[in-house]
Each structure stands twice: as C-alpha cells, then as structure tokens.
Amino acid sequence: MHLHYDLPYPKHDMTDEPVSFFTYPPDSDTKFIPKDPCVHKPLSIKQVMERKLHWITLGGQYDWTNRVYPGERPPEFPRDVAGLLETLFPETLAQAAIVNFYTPGDTMMMHRDVSEETDKGLVSLSMGCDALFMIAPNDVGKMSEEDRPGHGEKEHLLLRIRSGDAIYMTQEARYAWHGVPKVLKGTCPDYLEDWPAEDGKYEEWQGWMKNKRINLNVRQMRDC
C-alpha cells in the first residue's frame, strides 16, 4: 500500500511496547491518504484492516515489476521468526517472506515460485481459518494444453490446511504449481478468535481473527 498511500504509522509512546495499527480503534478518524487522489480514494483504518490489507513482506523486498530480488542488502528478517523457522526447517534460511491475509471469499491463483536463486525449500505456515491448498505437477512443459493449470481437469492434490499446519515444499515439490481455491468461513480455532484483543489490549478489535487466515510463506532468496 505504501506505493499508493501515505501510511499513518502509529507513534511510539514512552514505553517499549511495540506499536500496531490495532492501536487505532475501528472507528478512528485516521485515514490512509492516497498519493494520487485522482486514482485512489482515502481509506479508513477499518477498511484497511478488515478487507484492503492483503499482504505484507518481511526481509528481502521482491521487485514485482522486474520479478527479481534486488541486489542490495535487504531489511533484516525478524530474528524470533527466523529462529523458529530455521529450527524446524534447518535446510532453508529465512531471508524473505510474504504474509498473506485471507478472508473467506479470497483465493490465490495457481502459481509457481521461481524467482529465488536457489532450490532450497519453501516454508508455509497457516494460522486462523482452514483453507484448501492445491498442488499440481511442476513439469508443465510435458503437459498437454488441456492439462495445464486453469484448463479443466488435471492431476492435483487437494489438502485441507488447518491453523498451525506447516507445508514444506522441497525437492520435486519445490517448483510445483500451487494455490488456495477456498478459505473456509467459521473454522478459526476458539483460542484465536478474539486475537488481537488479549491482555486488555486492542479490545475494540476483538473477533478480528475469527474470519481471517494468515499465511506466512518463507523462502531463501539465494545460496550464501
């Protein structure tokens, strides 16, 4: 969103508490102001947090225009998240990630992750609502036109992914076609439904997570 809007980042107070957009109440007058009002309209905090925010990036910032990872030193990947992931999946260094925010009705089209300069595995962690995850053959060059993703029936595997599940795509699966055709409403675990309203904070956002799926998709950009 930073390409099209001036983001109203919350200010730090005198404590060491991390700041969050959840600091603003849903009915806040604070707006995301468009850089070009002729193209985009102002957005409220509620509009952004409930529907308009679809993804953020961590670590290496992918250049979506040129389909490459920039050569300069990337922002540091969050150490606590990297430590957890590299303990579970030691063969992949957590260098870049896309955090997707899904609401029931959202989908992710079939695609392949081929921009990384390494064949290290992809890590996908899910939180919140269940989703259907589809994975299909990666050798599209040997498939008939009718069998290619998006063209009728084809060989594929369909998995139901629940909160806390992890998928590690490596070896033959590393470059496979994959996507999310459906997010299942009302399937968020009870213990997550009230997040981020915990410990007396962000109470006005209670229930935000109830119809959300958050997917952390992590990859190593290049061999070290």
Swiss-Prot record:
Keyword annotations from UniProtKB, A to Z: Dioxygenase, Iron, Metal-binding, Oxidoreductase, Virulence
Needed cofactors: Fe(2+)
The protein's enzyme class: oxidoreductase
Phenotype of gene-disrupted mutants: Leads to a 1.95-fold increase of the m(6)A RNA methylation level, a slower growth rate and a significantly reduced sporulation. Also significantly reduces virulence on chestnut stems and red Fuji apples. Results in the up-regulation of genes primarily associated with amino acid biosynthesis, 2-oxocarboxylic acid metabolism, and ABC transporters, as well as alpha-amino acid metabolism, small-molecule biosynthesis, and the sulfite reductase complex (NADPH).
GO terms of biological process kind: DNA repair
PROSITE patterns, per database record: FE2OG_OXY (PS51471)
Entry's Gene Ontology cellular component terms: cytoplasm; nucleus
Domain Fe2OG dioxygenase: start-end pairs: 93-222
EC number: 1.14.11.53
Cofactor remark from the record: Binds 1 Fe(2+) ion per subunit.
Gene3D superfamilies, sorted: Alpha-ketoglutarate-dependent dioxygenase AlkB-like (2.60.120.590)
Molecular-function GO terms, alphabetical: dioxygenase activity; metal ion binding
Reactions it catalyzes: an N(6)-methyladenosine in mRNA + 2-oxoglutarate + O2 = an adenosine in mRNA + formaldehyde + succinate + CO2
PANTHER family recorded: ALKYLATED DNA REPAIR PROTEIN ALKB-RELATED, NUCLEIC ACID DIOXYGENASE ALKBH1
Family: Belongs to the alkB family.
Function: RNA demethylase that regulates the stability of mRNAs through an m(6)A-dependent manner. M6A is a modification present at internal sites of mRNAs and some non-coding RNAs and plays a role in mRNA stability and processing. Demethylate m6A at position A1935 within the 3'UTR of transcription factor ZAP1 and plays an important role in C.parasitica development and virulence.
Protein's recorded name: N6-methyladenosine RNA demethylase ALKBH
Annotated gene: ALKBH
